[in-house]
Amino acid sequence: MVNLKAKPYNMSIEEKIGQLFVNMGASRDEEYLKSVLNNYHIGAVRYNPGKAEEVYEQNRILQENSKIPLLIAANTEAGGNGACTDGTYVGNEVKIAATQDPHYAYELGRISGIEASAIGCNW
């Protein structure tokens, strides 16, 4: 477990500044991912969509090699397919709202959250 309250006191100015940035990664290459972490000390990442196995592996590499747990973004407003290409498409928010049934909104959020979380997305 990382003691996040004490962590900022043990960080260089470069590491503190790096925490402000989100990397829009274009590669899932392990050496590239490690290089981004070591050189830029990013606090978050957003990636290009891919199959669930690829995205999970990318997120595993990132979290295992980051000094502080990363925020990993996913656009899941229409379903798990925003986290990975083989995720479940539920429906965009306008379509869900048009049903006027809160159950569908709940299911959209539930499915999106389960699928994003399963591949390591947490933001």
Explain the meaning of each model-derived region:
Residues 26, 34-123:
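Enzymes and membrane/adaptor proteins characterized by extended Gly/Ser/Thr/Asp/Glu-rich
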